[in-house]
From Swiss-Prot:
GO MF, any single term: structural constituent of ribosome
Keyword ATP-binding: no
PROSITE patterns in the cross-refs: RIBOSOMAL_L19
Biological role stated in the UniProt entry: This protein is located at the 30S-50S ribosomal subunit interface and may play a role in the structure and function of the aminoacyl-tRNA binding site.
Pfam families: Ribosomal_L19
Keyword match Amino-acid biosynthesis: no
Species in which this protein is naturally found: Corynebacterium glutamicum (strain ATCC 13032 / DSM 20300 / JCM 1318 / BCRC 11384 / CCUG 27702 / LMG 3730 / NBRC 12168 / NCIMB 10025 / NRRL B-2784 / 534)
GO BP: translation
Matches recorded under SUPFAM superfamilies: Translation proteins SH3-like domain
Protein family according to the UniProt entry: Belongs to the bacterial ribosomal protein bL19 family.
UniProt-recorded name of the protein: Large ribosomal subunit protein bL19
GO cellular component annotations of the record: cytosolic large ribosomal subunit
Residue spans crossing the bilayer: none
Amino acid sequence: MNILDKIDAASLRDDVPAFRAGDTLDVHVKVIEGTTTRTQLFKGVVIRRQGGGIRETFTVRKVSFGIGVERTFPVHSPNIEKIEVIRRGDVRRAKLYYLRELRGKAARIKEKR
């Protein structure tokens, strides 16, 4: 192991649940506004997970008031308080970019049995 791997290993989180593209998540994000700190919930479908190690990220998509919102989070960020898996989705792709074009019921993902 070289020096960078040792530094990265010290920053890795161990409380990250197993999730993949198609799963519905609750991401609890720490938001700092001035002197106050609060937790903001972002709930949506994982459309991609990429990278590895300390640089690993995932993108969550939700529809808010009829507008699609996507947010990319680093998996090991200290600003993420916790990640909860709500539903396991049954998909055959690793990147679900096609969901951007779908509307309404067509954008739903089957639940894994």
